[in-house]
Amino acid sequence: MPFINIKITKEEGKVVSVEQKKALIDGVSNLLVDVLGKNKASIVVIIDEIDPDNYGLGGKTITQVRRGE
């Protein structure tokens, strides 16, 4: 059973819509079917939306990085 976890940082003023999430889930599932020959019914896809204060890069939060700090 393939397990795919997509992590997306939340962006100020932008929301990932339900339609976009459905498209991600379907698209990633189809990719595994096409490339790896997996059964679509067995593919698990989870989307985590991460607060930019809870994600770091280069010793700074993503919020700081986006502000240019």
Predicted features along the sequence, with ranges:
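A domain-level signal for the structural core that forms small-molecule/cofactor-binding pockets
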Residues: 1-69
